[in-house]
Amino acid sequence: MIFEAETPPWEIERRTLVRLDAETDPSYGCDPYKRPIEKLLKACVLNIDKPRGPTSHEIAFTVRELLGAEQAGHGGTLDPAVSGVLPILVDEATKCAEAVMKGGKEYVCVMRLHGEVSNEKLEEALKLFTGEIYQVPPVRSSVSRRIRTRTIYRIELLERDGRNVLLRIACSGGTYIRKLCSDIGLYLKCGAHMQELRRTRAGPFSEETAYTLLDLSLIHISEPTRLGMISY
């Protein structure tokens, strides 16, 4: 069952206008499609599939060391226990970090209910929590605990097994899924917590096009020219 308030940004059709008769003066630089791998890696974004365990900063550090880059950042923190899409911005691309972090996100999570709840009541709660919501960051967070406005574009009820509820959530950047599960539990008057979480999308980057650190290491060693093909 799907509860949708509005279409997520990445599903909105966008068109790019191209002047076919235009030419770029070679003195301004190289054709993007003909740039050497060294230049591409000086301003690229790598879509990394973060495993559970390491911090987001540790992933960024590993990528920086592997590529021999001067700096690397990430497009939105994932807690150590959370896996999934983590865009890593390299060198010049770090200037775009804020734009990537503000992009929409999509997660798949397991919410654990603390009591018995009917399907009807659960669906009522999920519908209520779509659209614009108010949210206070969790106690353990890196930002000040003041009320913020966030948008839940869509909540999809994928599966339910007793008190375990599998959800796919599309939301605006800065949404705390852990707090969302807790707030749903408060509304249901039984309590709930986020048991497991995976990020499946961050802006234009999805898990279908993500590479693990092992993938990146093997490509860097055996097929370095492919790095330009998997970067953005």
Q: For the regions a protein language model found, what residue spans apply to each?
A:
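Non-catalytic RNA-recognition surface used by pseudouridine synthases
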Residues: 1-83, 89-218
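Single conserved hydrophobic/aromatic residue that forms the stacking wall/gate
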Residues: 219-232
